[in-house]
Structure formats: C-alpha cells, structure tokens
Amino acid sequence: MELSWGRAFWRNFLGQSPDWYKLALIAFLIANPLIFFINPFVAGWLLVAEFIFTLAMALKCYPLLPGGLLAIEAVIIGMTSAAHVREEVAANLEVLLLLMFMVAGIYFMKQLLLFIFTRLLLSIRSKMLLSLAFCMAAAFLSAFLDALTVVAVVISVAVGFYGIYHRVASARGEENDLQDDDHLDQNSKAVLEQFRGFLRSLMMHAGVGTALGGVMTMVGEPQNLIIAKAAGWHFGDFFLRMSPVTVPVLICGLFTCVLVEKLRWFGYGETLPEKVRHILQEFDDQSRQRRTRQDKLNLFVQAIIGVWLVTALALHLAEVGLIGLSVIILATSLTGVTDEHAIGKAFTESLPFTALLTVFFSIVAVIIDQHLFAPIIQFVLQASEHAQLTLFYLFNGLLSSISDNVFVGTIYINEAKAAMESGAISMKQYELLAVAINTGTNLPSVATPNGQAAFLFLLTSALAPLIRLSYGRMVWMALPYTLVLTLVGLLCVEFTLTPITEWMTQSGWLATFS
C-alpha cells in the first residue's frame, strides 16, 4: 500500500533521524517566532541553545540541516539580516578558503601520510613508544595540516590493517564482510578483540595528538585562524604567543600518553598480537615489492610539496587557503591526477563542514545583533585583568566541550574585540585574552566528540563500529587527557602566560603592544 502524502513528507523530513528529534526541531521552529515577538533577547538565547543542541546531536542528523533551518528562520523573522550574514562570511573568508582548499590539498598527500603511519606501526615494537610516536606524529602534522585530514589518514591505515587480518582470519578472501565475525574460530576472535583494543588506543592517541598540535599554530584548527586574524597575528606571532600555554600542555599530554599505556588505565595498554603483526608485515613486504618507480616518485614529490607547505605557512607567503590551492595544483600536476572526478573527491570531506561554518556565522550575526553575550562579557570585564584570563578560559572550555569549538571561539573573540575597540580593555589585555580564548576553546574540547571535529569524524567513520568505539567509550578514554589538558592549560593561563609574554616582548621576540 502506497504511503499517504503526510506520511511520505514525514519520512522525507530529516530522513532517518528519530521521530522525537524531528518533533523537537518542529517545536523549535514554531516557538522561536512567537518568543521573538515577545522578548527578542530570550528568543536569541533560545536559538543559541537550540543550535548547540543540534551540534550535540550530530550523530542523529548532520547539524547543517537543522541548524540551517533555524538560521533561515532567524533571518526571516528579523533576528538578523541577510546583509549581516554576508558581512560575517566575508570577514571570515580566509577560514572558508582554509577548509575548501587546504583540506582538499592534503587529500593529494595522503599517499605520503599513509606511508609514514604504516612505517611507524610496523617498525616500532614497543606499544608505549608506538603510542607516543602516533601522538607526536599527529601533533606535528596537525600543526601544519588540517586535523580532520590527519585523523582520516590514520583511519585509512587502521581500516586497511583491520581488513587484512580479518580477511586472512576468516579465510574468505575478497568476499569477506568486515562486520561479520561468524566465520572466525574462537582463537581468532580472541586475537581480533585484542587487535581492536590496540587500534582503539592508537586512534585515541592520534586524535588527542591532533588537539595537542592543532592548538599551537594558526592553521591547526579553523577557529585559530579566526582568532589570529582578529588579533592581527601571522604564523610565527601566533606560535610564540600560544607557547607559554601550549608547550607545557604538549609535554604533559605526551607524558599522559606514556602513563596510561604503562599503567593500562582507561582502556589503554593493549599490544599488537604477534599473529596480526606477522600477517601485516607479510602484506607490507608484498606491497613494497610491487611499488613502481612512479609510486616512489609520487612519494618524493609529495614530500617536497610538504616542505613547500611548511615553508609557505611559516613565512606567510600567501593566505592559508591560497597556499592550500597551490598544494592542489602542484600535487595534481606532478603526480598525474588530471581527471575532474578524481580531483572532485578531494572536496567531499571539507565542503559539508564549510557549509556548516557558514551557518555558524549566521548564528554569530544573531548574537551580535541581539547583544546576547553582553551580560556575560560585562560580568567578566568587572573582574580584575588577571581573573579575566581565567574566566574566559573556563567559559570557553565549558561551552567547547559540548558544542563545536569553531562556533564558541568565534563568539568570544568577537566579544573581546568589541570590548577592546570600545576602550573597556587595553590592547595588551586583548592579546592575552585571545590566547586564553584559543587555548580554552581547543584544550577542554577533547572531553567529548561534540567539541572536536576530528573526534566526531572518527566516531562517525566506518572504523568506529569495527573496533567497537562507541560515544561512551570515547569519552571514557579521553577522560585522562581531558583532565590533564584542561588543568595544565588553566594553570599556565593563570601563572605563566602573562610573565612569559612580557619577557618575550622585552626580549624583542614579539611586537610591542600598541
């Protein structure tokens, strides 16, 4: 029997999302205009809460859809204007270019990144050293590349290795279904469980590594670029200004990596089974024998492009997005990727998030027009200058752990800049607040997959169900890192940020505050 028109529409509306989620969104869309005409301030805060809800429920429905509907309605009923949204998008064009071109550019360097992580996995036998190597490699790469791409590469390595062992263990060849363990004997199942635990811990170490490295540079995370632009910092300035907080946090984060592996806490400590290592080593040996001169040349070319990328970013030779575009052009030209469809695949990872970021800017426009954060900012600015840094760090951290850190970082840096321009705070204090906002946005956000886009990407990937990585397990495994990164970051903002920044300024490392 064919569906009625009403039932067909209900099924189409937000697709596979649960009915309660659809009803909640409809309730939001009905309530917002009514409340707005009674009290615009309350309606504005309600919209922000609803938008954070859509981000927190990202596994139920990609936030672009419900968030986009809320943003469109906000413009229609007059919470903000289309012209203001355009201004916000124009002001953040560099971030959109970063997401469009840099992420796509790194896609064409995946072969090199896969090679690096494969060599790490098979050449280091100590699990503790391997975990440290994965965490450090992810941190270094994320300081220059997009964290999503780094995690995507590690996922590719893990899925590939999982598939190799699963195929051999099930003896089903190419017809093997990775989700089906029924064809494995008891011994193979036990080995597979250990292998899953091993991969889970490596993925979490790599994920946290992207946060440790990503906070240090202006290209590590999208919100970093927004904050750097608002403060007028280039690559070197940003790194030096963040270093009083980020360097101690990096050291303590790496120490935490070693500690949880050694003590086997929070689900860490599983080693690579020898049976699996033998199978993977055999496969890698065969792959190396099949590698042609063309393949080797591609790896060399990608390494040279990597050097260009780091140099161009460090010397600020062009806007970040344009450097990413140059990577696309060089990588495709020199490795023979000429088909339009092959090039188009590089953009599939970044464009949904780029569209979502544009919706973020619509909500930011509402926040500005309705003066939603004015009471919070006034409360913070009434505190002493020293206490302001701690409060900004904590407020950012709290919101970033449940919401997207790009959204949170954008809101707070805009408010801090407005306070500076109005004369409420000095330029010196504003630049210190920018550091507190950036570190507060990046570090505590490892608490949940909602805060870190790389974690959410891992949770929604094809790998997560294979290695039994659920939302709850991810939060539990991230807990030691959450505590260490948040507390060390807070202590550094409290005690080391101001004196070290002043020392670097007096030493001539930083430009004198204007």
UniProtKB/Swiss-Prot annotation:
InterPro entries cross-referenced by the UniProt entry: Na+/H+_antiporter_NhaB (IPR004671)
Keyword Flavoprotein found: no
Localization per Swiss-Prot or TrEMBL: Cell inner membrane
Pfam families assigned: NhaB
Protein task: Na(+)/H(+) antiporter that extrudes sodium in exchange for external protons.
Catalytic reaction list: 2 Na(+)(in) + 3 H(+)(out) = 2 Na(+)(out) + 3 H(+)(in)
Molecular function via GO: sodium:proton antiporter activity
Coiled-coil annotated residue ranges, if any: none
Family: Belongs to the NhaB Na(+)/H(+) (TC 2.A.34) antiporter family.
Topology within the bilayer: Multi-pass membrane protein
UniProt main location, coarse: membrane
Secretion signal, residue range per the UniProt entry: none
Transmembrane spans: 23-43, 63-83, 97-117, 120-140, 144-164, 202-222, 238-258, 303-323, 357-377, 391-411, 447-467, 475-495
Protein name in UniProt: Na(+)/H(+) antiporter NhaB
Organism: Citrobacter koseri (strain ATCC BAA-895 / CDC 4225-83 / SGSC4696)
Keywords assigned: Antiport, Cell inner membrane, Cell membrane, Ion transport, Membrane, Sodium, Sodium transport, Transmembrane, Transmembrane helix, Transport
Entry GO terms, CC: plasma membrane
Keyword presence, Transit peptide: no
